[in-house]
């Protein structure tokens, strides 16, 4: 299903499928981010006049709101992989919807491949749907053996604004974004959504803007490491005056911030790239693709006509890549290889939109053999099955399995977010901050 931002894919399609009685089982919808999963479930529940957890619920790592009466369950992508590994026939599940499939995360690609095998071998009644506003639909439709349905939806017009000339090398990126935001603020009405690559850039732009905007303008950061309550506050309408939401790509898809009429796109995105030197992924900052720029601009046209200010020129726009790379091409395949081994099939036995590169998969399998997760023939070991139960990189899971619970805090610091990142303190104080996040240590 292809439809522009604001057409109603995320919040209308599951409810329409339920109303049409297309399946007697539960409808499972995958979202790439936890905030989007909760927000989508809450919006659908609000639409039908029920609290979350009745007909519509959600399940993400660490929390869930579902009940025996739940018919639509919104989950993050890793949840589906775990469900398939535990019960391959997906009992009580009638349909699986892959929302925002253009992001092509490893979990989404693997989940679709496993679901296709389940549908072919065990569940010929299982309905599979892939949705996006910017999907390269042809290859996906071919793998799914499914028709492409395109809807124009009812997104509002968004007027693009480009820079007159490329940014001078003497101007810092954050300053350029702040300048563009101030221009947009003076030329338009309504609240503003500013896209930045990461938390550091958000804080620096925040510092540049806070003394230049008027008292009726609220600045609201929005990034993945924030608590959910703070994220909810950021996407809520401004209580008075205007709001400037400074966000990472967390706000790129599946979210509607009601009073946003203006988008400022910094033109950069942060993605995970596999680093052979460290054997793990690292975050790199790259130019956005046309697909990502389209998604971002669409945030300004969700509820009314809007404007999108791009921090690049019209000429530079034509040089953007069409789509971001699939994670299966650029990311770390160690966890992916472990899941395949638990499943018991090689990649050649599954239908992937983009098959994994043989050499990079072999490297990942070699790491798993070194950790004791695979035997010499590449088969899963009991230790490997234990590693697969952790929502962690296999290296960190191995550390916990080997060193015991004392290693859990170090794994949490490495896998999630150091609460004292950027502060020069020793490990003991960092773990203390992790145990007591409300305690003031500095």
Model feature map: region roles:
Residues 1-399:
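P-loop NTPase motor module signature
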Residues 335, 354, 369-375, 391-442:
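C-terminal helicase lobe and adjacent C-terminal extensions/tails of nucleic-acid helicase motors
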């Amino acid at each position: 299903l292809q439809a522009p931002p604001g057409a109603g894919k995320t919040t209308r399609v599951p409810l329409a499928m339920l109303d049409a009685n297309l399946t007697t089982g539960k409808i499972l919808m995958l979202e790439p981010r936890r905030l989007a999963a909760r927000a989508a479930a809450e919006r659908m529940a609000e639409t039908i006049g029920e609290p979350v957890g009745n007909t519509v619920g959600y399940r993400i790592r660490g929390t869930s709101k579902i009940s025996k009466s739940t018919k639509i369950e919104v989950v993050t992508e890793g949840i589906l992989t775990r469900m398939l590994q535990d019960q391959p026939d997906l009992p009580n599940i009638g349909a699986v919807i892959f929302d925002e499939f253009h992001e092509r995360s490893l979990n989404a690609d693997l989940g679709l491949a496993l679901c296709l095998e389940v549908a072919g071998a065990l569940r010929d009644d299982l309905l599979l749907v892939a949705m996006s506003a910017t999907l390269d639909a042809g290859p996906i439709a071919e793998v799914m053996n499914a028709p492409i349905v395109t809807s124009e939806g009812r997104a509002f017009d968004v007027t693009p604004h480009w820079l007159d000339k490329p940014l001078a090398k003497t101007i810092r990126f954050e300053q350029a974004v702040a300048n563009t935001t101030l221009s947009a603020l003076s030329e338009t009405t309504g609240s503003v959504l500013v896209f930045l690559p990461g938390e550091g850039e958000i804080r620096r732009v925040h510092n540049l803007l806070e003394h230049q905007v008027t008292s009726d303008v609220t600045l609201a950061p929005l990034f993945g490491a924030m608590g959910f309550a703070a994220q909810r506050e950021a996407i809520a309408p401004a209580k008075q005056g205007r709001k400037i939401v400074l966000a990472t790509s967390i706000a790129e898809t599946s979210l509607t911030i009601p009073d946003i009429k203006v988008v400022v796109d910094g033109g950069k995105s942060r993605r995970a790239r596999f680093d052979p030197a460290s054997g793990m992924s690292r975050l790199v900052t790259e130019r956005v693709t046309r697909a990502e720029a389209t998604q971002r601009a669409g945030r300004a046209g969700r509820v009314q006509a809007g404007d999108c200010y791009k921090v690049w020129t019209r000429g530079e726009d034509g040089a953007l890549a069409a789509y971001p790379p699939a994670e299966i091409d650029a990311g770390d395949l160690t966890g992916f290889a472990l899941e395949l081994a638990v499943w018991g099939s090689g990649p050649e036995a599954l239908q992937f939109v983009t098959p994994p590169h043989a050499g990079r998969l072999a490297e990942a399998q070699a790491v798993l053999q070194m950790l004791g997760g695979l035997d010499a023939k590449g088969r899963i070991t009991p230790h490997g099955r234990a590693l697969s139960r952790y929502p962690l990189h296999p290296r960190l899971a191995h550390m916990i399995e080997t060193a015991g619970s004392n290693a859990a805090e170090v794994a949490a610091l490495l896998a999630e977010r150091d609460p004292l990142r950027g502060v020069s303190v020793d490990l003991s104080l960092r773990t203390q901050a992790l145990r007591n996040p409300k305690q003031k240590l500095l």
